[in-house]
């Protein structure tokens, strides 16, 4: 069984609608390339979305900067998934009492990430947001917590 199918099977019980959306998506919007340190990285339309050298280290440095102003009780919101390095790093460094939501603007990119990145328990610590722009805005508005937005610029 391939990594994508393993992930979809593993998250189906908790996130059945997300699995359906990913299954219906064609994927293939990210071009996967091996980074110099060996883990997968990716480009989209010729632009690196994570470091071509060490995507984990880059994500950890970025997350450390983001968490300086993130407080307990806030819902951190990440716009975009990339290969999820930045999401994983935020989960690892989020303040006690803070929550994290990830807005999946492009379900095809999410599917590509599931096909190449191993998931850990951190995946279930995230509130996943997807759908139309109106649906995503409604989902975020219903969270009843102060929102702190994080954006992850391409490498």
Language-model features, listed with the residues they occupy:
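N-terminal donor/sugar-recognition subdomains of glycan-related enzymes
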Residues: 1-155
């Amino acid at each position: 069984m391939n990594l994508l199918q393993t992930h979809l099977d593993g998250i189906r019980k908790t996130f059945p609608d997300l699995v359906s959306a990913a299954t219906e998506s064609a994927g293939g919007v990210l071009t996967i390339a091996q980074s110099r340190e060996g883990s997968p990285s990716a480009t989209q339309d010729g632009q690196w979305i994570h470091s071509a050298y060490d995507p984990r280290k880059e994500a950890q440095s970025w997350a450390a900067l983001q968490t300086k102003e993130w407080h307990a009780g806030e819902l951190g919101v990440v716009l975009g998934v990339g290969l999820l390095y930045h999401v994983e790093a935020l989960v690892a460094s989020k303040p006690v009492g803070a929550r994290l939501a990830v807005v999946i603007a492009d379900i095809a990119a999410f599917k590509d990430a599931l096909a190449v990145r191993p998931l850990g328990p951190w995946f279930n610590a995230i509130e996943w947001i997807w759908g139309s722009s109106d649906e995503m805005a409604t989902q975020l508005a219903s969270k009843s917590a102060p929102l702190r937005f994080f954006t992850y610029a391409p490498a």
